Curated annotation (Swiss-Prot):
One of its GO terms (cellular component) is cytoplasm. The gene is argB. Its EC number is 2.7.2.8. Catalyzes the ATP-dependent phosphorylation of N-acetyl-L-glutamate. This is Acetylglutamate kinase. Keywords: Amino-acid biosynthesis, Arginine biosynthesis, ATP-binding, Cytoplasm, Kinase, Nucleotide-binding, Transferase. It comes from Thiobacillus denitrificans (strain ATCC 25259 / T1). Belongs to the acetylglutamate kinase family. ArgB subfamily. GO terms for molecular function: acetylglutamate kinase activity; ATP binding. Transmembrane segments: none annotated.
Length: 293
């Protein structure tokens, strides 16, 4: 390593100092998904990022999805995946697969990677400690305005008890949450990971909630990244079709989070190696930051 290269690295580290100081002992909820969960080098980079955030005094909470892995296992057992309005129809057999993949395979893979890089991760689902309360979600029919569709064991969050997360944080563990919930009768529900991350961040009054996606962030009509937005600006961008398609629910979850007391929400590109550190510890960031004003 040359002196010049060493000096560049030292400068980068010193640039992170004000952010380390600002976010010390703050909670950062990270929705982990997309390519960052399926490409091994990105998975390793993500685990290192989470461990580093913890080591410099922040409290990361990871909430993960697992759609591709669920689809892969369903295909292997010969079961067709069915979606209604973007949501997976979850019958009993599908729920068994969802619980196996989210609560077992994917969750433990993330835990193992974080621990491999020096963290102390603990895997759990929303059923553990009964901390994610849910009820059956019904979806409005597009054909009949007054008809509600039953899509199986897909859940709508009715409440979150944050105690188990707070206990783990206080003991310097890193919670890794699979988005499964339960009702008073013990019925299990598959829950959208973006929704779960936003709700958990709101209940914890987190400093940040970060949604890792397969896009750079929110783009304008010229496909240029919009680095900062408010809820009102987002409404205007939806109205003029700048924000459309799958980005609409994503920004909706981000707006819900900041309206519930989360300081800032971020939509970042999980395909960028070390995107998490770049968003939290640099002045430029790598995605779109959303805050109330």
């Amino acid at each position: 390593m040359t002196v010049h290269t060493a000096a560049e690295k030292a400068y980068i580290l010193s640039e992170a100092l004000p952010y380390i100081q600002r976010f010390y002992d703050k909670t950062i909820v990270i929705k982990y998904g997309g390519n960052a969960m399926t490409e091994r080098h990105l998975m390793e980079a993500f685990a290192k990022d989470v461990v580093l955030l913890k080591l410099v005094g922040m409290n990361p909470v990871v909430v993960h999805g697992g759609g591709p892995q669920i689809a892969g296992l369903l295909q292997r057992i010969g079961k067709q995946s069915e979606f209604i309005q973007g949501m997976r129809v979850t019958d009993e057999e599908t729920l068994d697969v969802v619980e196996m993949v989210l609560g077992g395979l994917v969750n433990q893979d993330i835990v193992t990677l974080i621990n491999k890089h020096g963290g102390r991760a603990v895997g759990l689902t929303g059923k553990d400690g009964n901390f994610i309360h849910a009820k059956k979600m019904l979806v409005k029919s597009k054909e009949k305005a007054d008809e509600m569709l039953d899509i199986g064991q897909v859940g709508e969050i009715t409440g979150i008890d944050p105690e188990i997360i707070q206990v783990l944080d206080a003991r310097d563990f890193i919670p890794v949450v699979a988005p499964l919930g339960t009702d008073a009768e013990g019925n299990a529900y598959n829950i959208n990971a973006d929704v779960a991350a936003g709700k958990i961040a709101g209940v914890l009054q987190a400093e940040k909630v970060i949604f890792m996606t397969n896009t750079p962030g929110v783009l304008d009509k010229d496909k240029k990244l919009l680095t900062g937005l408010t809820p009102r600006e987002i409404s205007d961008l939806i109205a003029d079709d700048t924000i459309s398609g799958g980005m609409i629910p994503k920004v909706g979850y981000a707006v819900d989070a900041v309206n519930s007391g989360v300081k800032t929400a971020h939509i970042i590109d999980g395909r960028v190696e070390h995107a998490l550190l770049l968003e939290v510890l640099t002045p430029e960031g790598v995605g779109t930051l959303i805050k109330r004003s």
